[in-house]
Amino acid sequence: MKYNSVIRKAIFLRRPNRFQAYVVLDDEELLVHVPNTGRCREILKEGCTVLLRKGTTPNRKTPYDLIAAYKGEILINIDSQIPNKVVEEALINKKIEKLVNFNNISREKTFGNSRFDFKLQDDNENIYFLEVKGVTLEENGETRFPDAPTERGKKHILELIEIKKLGMGAGIIFLIQIDNVNKFSPNDETDPKFGEALRLAKKEGVDIFAYNCKVTEEEIELLNPVEIVL
């Protein structure tokens, strides 16, 4: 998907809280919005180059959103709203092999006590629930999720297991918002319970996908599946 707004480059200074950051744009210090509540400590370091997207709401306190950052030569998209849009585009364009038969795509559907990112249905009325997780934590070509403990993430996985037991399809896709990575694993060091739940889900037949992305200063799109090591 292409960014449908003005993109500017800036220099990252600091992040006083989860939702805001200070950058230097056109030689002036500016407060911007960070659309990602994760820590991103390995990415947002003082002096790194970041990408800003012009906000569409007039008169808001932060005129730009900080949507991506360079980690050395690697551009990482950190906008938490992007993964669902990228996956939806991939589903429509039949880029996820196991899900190509699902033509009916619905967003934000509830089952049990959870709301899932996608509810899919094929021509035979088979139902499949799909949850999307954006991945930004990378080291030496290997990626992990989450970068902070996530009780909600574990809850989603356990609900997917129940969906599978009821005879419906269930899957979780880790969208790695980075190019040139070759492996994905749960971050057991940060959240061992999430890793335990993911391994249980695999055992119970829940599909686990991990895809990297083509990330440029103009667009981001789903690229290739990567190795999953549980």
UniProtKB/Swiss-Prot annotation:
Transmembrane segments: none annotated. This is Sugar fermentation stimulation protein homolog. InterPro entries: SfsA, SfsA_C, SfsA_N. PANTHER family: SUGAR FERMENTATION STIMULATION PROTEIN A (PTHR30545:SF2). GO terms for molecular function: DNA binding. Belongs to the SfsA family.
